[in-house]
Each structure stands twice: as structure tokens, then as C-alpha cells.
């Protein structure tokens, strides 16, 4: 039930809604700590992780992850509707003057370079849709995309479900500098 009243009805019955939340970086502790603890020790991975943390440090994450089919930058059906919900947040007066950060991720299968390129294509695909859906609200320089590759997994890459969870894009917002 995608309407606000439908989601409120679901919440009133104690069920989990699909309403998006805005989560500050400070509330991402346990999730991001696992990234550091599971991090690779090679220099390229460490640089990507550092860049991710630097960009997201004063940002807030929109609470949905956009999923992709394996090996490509094609959004799944749910992600297409989630982008519309993200656009509603972007267009709200509350976030006027904010920029949007789009972080693409991959599972760990394949080389780091290939996964970084794939995750960048995923982030770019979401960026393109956000720009297309929000003329007058977002201009090219208000949306930045980054490929993070397999650096920050949310699932175990040893299982199909875990790999699916890791093939995602996260959208964050922060005040423009």
C-alpha cells in the first residue's frame, strides 16, 4: 500500500512500513564498523573506504537500498518505485539546498577494478533517473555518484541472498557546502 494513509494504517497495526527514514551518519555505527573490520588490507580498497567515509561523514542516509540484477546496472522493479519515493524527499522544502550523494556497491565476485566500475555504473544509473525525475529541483552538480564496489558489504558474499543484498545503491543527502 504505497500511499501515506496506507502506510500509516500499516504502522498503526504494529507492522513495518515502507516509509523512508532519514538516518544521520552518527546512527550508522554498527553497520559501518563491520565495513572497517571486514575491510581488505590493500591500498586501493582502503582508499575507496576512506573516500566513502569522507563523503558520507556529514550526510544522512535515506533508508532504502536500491537493488540491481547480477552483473549489470539494471534496477529491479522495487527500486524503480523506491526512486520515486526518494524523489519526493528531494523535492520537499525541508531538504532545499541539499545535495544528493549516490553510492553504488557490488558483491565481491570478480576483480576490485571490475566491481568498482560496475558499482559506478549503478550509481550513475540512479543519478540519471533522479535528475530526470526532478527537473528544477536537482541540477547536475547537485547529485554526485560514487562507485564503492565490494568495500562495504551488508550481506555475506558466500550466499546468493548476501550477494543480492550487496548489489545496491544507497542515496544520502547533505547540506551543500
Functional labels for PLM-detected ranges:
Residues 78, 105-177:
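Periplasmic OmpA-like peptidoglycan-binding domain that tethers envelope proteins to the cell wall
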Residues 2-99, 175-177:
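Periplasmic peptidoglycan-binding/tethering modules of Gram-negative envelope proteins
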Amino acid at each position: 500500500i504505497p500511499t501515506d494513509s496506507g502506510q500509516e494504517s500499516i504502522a498503526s497495526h504494529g507492522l513495518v512500513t515502507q516509509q523512508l527514514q532519514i538516518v544521520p551518519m552518527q546512527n550508522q555505527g554498527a553497520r559501518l564498523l563491520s565495513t572497517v573490520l571486514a575491510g581488505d588490507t590493500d591500498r586501493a580498497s582502503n582508499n575507496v573506504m576512506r573516500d566513502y567515509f569522507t563523503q558520507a561523514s556529514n550526510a544522512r542516509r535515506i533508508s532504502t537500498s536500491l537493488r540491481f540484477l547480477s552483473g549489470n546496472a539494471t534496477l529491479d522493479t522495487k527500486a524503480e518505485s523506491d526512486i520515486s519515493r526518494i524523489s519526493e524527499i528531494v523535492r520537499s522544502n525541508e531538504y532545499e539546498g541539499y545535495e544528493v550523494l549516490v553510492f553504488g556497491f557490488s558483491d565481491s565476485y570478480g576483480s576490485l577494478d571490475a566491481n568498482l566500475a560496475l558499482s559506478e555504473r549503478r550509481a550513475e544509473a540512479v543519478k540519471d533517473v533522479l535528475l530526470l525525475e526532478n527537473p528544477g529541483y536537482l541540477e547536475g552538480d547537485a547529485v554526485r555518484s560514487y562507485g564503492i564496489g565490494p568495500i562495504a558489504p551488508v550481506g555475506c558474499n558466500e550466499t546468493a541472498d548476501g550477494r543480492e543484498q550487496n548489489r545496491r545503491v544507497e542515496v544520502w543527502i547533505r547540506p551543500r557546502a
